[in-house]
């Protein structure tokens, strides 16, 4: 066995570093009984590394490439081209040339071969990289093959491969390349087999694409392919494409395109028997690798050859339940306005805090709704409740229920038992007294509890810290699920629903509660947005401080402020803001996310924008304007009601509900603020313990604790021992999860059920969502995916995936809101109503459909957006 060249049969599972992802998978496939793989061998990474290892020009250019940022596309292109030229000019090591000649004589010099790149960062379970390097078909002759080996080496530095590595965090120095030399087969048909449906992600449905000739035509998008769907050894769907072209190999080498005769273009590529045979092969390969596969196949004289198999890395993972039953899962992140992947410690804390049973998948949390959907008593309540906050979830759940036999409905006897335990409590129960002091007292009790936690935490160390946190989480749950607190929140929400329903019924006015909700008391989140305007007012008179803050890059700036006139006053104002709100950040329900207090420079761009866009005293003006609008709307509604039949009674009922709304609706944001405050205290204590673990050489980095569950961290602190494989495994998983888009609803088959909005009476080009804050507004769309990248001007419309309280400071600068995630009572909706901003949420793919800088019109009352 040569270290330069390995036959497919010689490749071992541990040799990724030698043969890359594609080569390793071909070696594995060759060892599966009954699977036909065209013969071939791999020119290992050793040959490539010897060829370029001592090349000074190559190393110099590689170092230059490593210094570039992904935005520098032109420079990346220039250096990548120079690297490719250097590689094409190198001599292939003699040992490689001799080994290739030996294997070619063994397999047949006269044969045609496919020459394929196989990078060490390709076809991995957590990063596909498919198609980033080059493939050459029907290459004949030793010298020709050697030249194409160099072309494959050079393709490691195509612009697309370099940029893809940069996007995925791979070091160019750490990636190597092998070249696969595989005997060509000349198929009548070829294509791609997915062992899970790539459209719906259903793991029980195989999807086969098939066309005539070589698969290159299909992969490169030259032809449409037949598509066959197979489920449980039965063909459940066939779409026969019009196939006008095919690519075939030429005897003298290379490939050629051929037109297909018109009378043959609609022929089915594979017979039913061949489709089912291919499906069985796919399931066999999937079982061997242990995960869904993307498989390239060829049909030659009734024999199916497999030329490649790689993991499908784009499928959303399924929550693990191994009971053989069907399950339906609902995303928690879509309700919490945080759909980012969470690290293991973040997931642990949220699971410890919540009262509802949840399961993990893809770095997110899901609730198993199966039992509640099976029960007539709870099904309608669940669907209607979720439907108010997210119509897409309601539509998806309705789709599942309408499928026969997917969810086992309860029998008549079970229905009787279920009625007694599953009927939700009536909303009239526990109606609180209409007294704003109740809210004041709840807030005061929460603040006292947090101060006590701070004092107690200072006395703990080691494993006692973790034990104490577990105890305190019970206290946190008592605060979060306090019956009086929940009653207050429900009273505010019910008042909002009542006002909207009755005002539309009696006066024909839609969403009247939106204006009435402006500038209410006790909304800790909207108060935070206004407080940052006040900080801007403190800084405004000091031009030296403003000039300094415009160039702040690290978090030591607070201590340096005192060298400027007004600097101490500015520092105190920022400190005061951080003392009250510094535990917040974007994605704050994940305890591992960096808080404003940990990185104060994060809030400086927002402050500078406020100084630029607003006059002194803007926070008080904004609050007063909102209050006057709300009072004016109340007066107008009551006057109109007075003239209706039973007007006096309607006025009294409405006044009471408006009072409920304005007294209670602001409090809805407070329990979460208390939870996040506690999380920050827990986090600070855990980071101190992590620092000790680093000092004791148990951890490499303090933030490695984020990749442990709470239970694992407890054990590490107790024993001072850690198997670092856990950290590496979770880091790789998190990298994958970050790239995935979580579904609102997913089944135990892995099928993603997507809901749809009703489009009646809307413009044809309208982008539809859920109306949550009334009004119509036109403006420049600013598509922002990370709050840190926000550069908003007064009057912009914010378009983003989701907003949570950490985004609130941006709301004072915008005049409209569009989000991909959200509901009537989620963060963005509540704050938009309070600030009087037209808003549409739950807009599927809003950040892709709307381009940054486009002028758009947001219809916050009707729930759609127009691109102008």
UniProtKB/Swiss-Prot annotation:
<dbReference type="InterPro" id="IPR051549">
    <property type="entry name" value="PEP_Utilizing_Enz"/>
</dbReference>
<comment type="similarity">
    <text>Belongs to the rifampicin phosphotransferase family.</text>
</comment>
<dbReference type="GO" id="GO:0046677">
    <property type="term" value="P:response to antibiotic"/>
</dbReference>
<protein>
    <recommendedName>
        <fullName>Rifampicin phosphotransferase</fullName>
        <ecNumber>2.7.9.6</ecNumber>
    </recommendedName>
</protein>
<comment type="function">
    <text>Catalyzes the phosphorylation of rifampicin, also known as rifampin (RIF), leading to its inactivation. Confers high level resistance to a variety of clinically used rifamycin antibiotics. Does not show phosphoenolpyruvate (PEP) synthase activity.</text>
</comment>
<feature type="binding site">
    <location>
        <position position="116"/>
    </location>
    <ligand>
        <name>ATP</name>
    </ligand>
</feature>
<feature type="binding site">
    <location>
        <position position="308"/>
    </location>
    <ligand>
        <name>ATP</name>
    </ligand>
</feature>
<feature type="active site" description="Tele-phosphohistidine intermediate">
    <location>
        <position position="827"/>
    </location>
</feature>
<feature type="region of interest" description="ATP-binding">
    <location>
        <begin position="1"/>
        <end position="313"/>
    </location>
</feature>
<keyword id="KW-0418">Kinase</keyword>
<dbReference type="InterPro" id="IPR008279">
    <property type="entry name" value="PEP-util_enz_mobile_dom"/>
</dbReference>
<dbReference type="GO" id="GO:0005524">
    <property type="term" value="F:ATP binding"/>
</dbReference>
<keyword id="KW-0046">Antibiotic resistance</keyword>
<feature type="binding site">
    <location>
        <position position="310"/>
    </location>
    <ligand>
        <name>ATP</name>
    </ligand>
</feature>
<dbReference type="InterPro" id="IPR013815">
    <property type="entry name" value="ATP_grasp_subdomain_1"/>
</dbReference>
<keyword id="KW-0067">ATP-binding</keyword>
<dbReference type="InterPro" id="IPR036637">
    <property type="entry name" value="Phosphohistidine_dom_sf"/>
</dbReference>
<feature type="binding site">
    <location>
        <position position="135"/>
    </location>
    <ligand>
        <name>ATP</name>
    </ligand>
</feature>
<keyword id="KW-0808">Transferase</keyword>
<feature type="region of interest" description="Rifampicin-binding">
    <location>
        <begin position="326"/>
        <end position="756"/>
    </location>
</feature>
<dbReference type="Pfam" id="PF01326">
    <property type="entry name" value="PPDK_N"/>
</dbReference>
<feature type="region of interest" description="Swivel phosphohistidine">
    <location>
        <begin position="769"/>
        <end position="867"/>
    </location>
</feature>
<feature type="binding site">
    <location>
        <position position="296"/>
    </location>
    <ligand>
        <name>ATP</name>
    </ligand>
</feature>
<feature type="binding site">
    <location>
        <position position="182"/>
    </location>
    <ligand>
        <name>ATP</name>
    </ligand>
</feature>
<feature type="binding site">
    <location>
        <position position="22"/>
    </location>
    <ligand>
        <name>ATP</name>
    </ligand>
</feature>
<dbReference type="Pfam" id="PF00391">
    <property type="entry name" value="PEP-utilizers"/>
</dbReference>
<dbReference type="InterPro" id="IPR002192">
    <property type="entry name" value="PPDK_AMP/ATP-bd"/>
</dbReference>
<dbReference type="GO" id="GO:0008986">
    <property type="term" value="F:pyruvate, water dikinase activity"/>
</dbReference>
<keyword id="KW-0547">Nucleotide-binding</keyword>
<feature type="binding site">
    <location>
        <position position="131"/>
    </location>
    <ligand>
        <name>ATP</name>
    </ligand>
</feature>
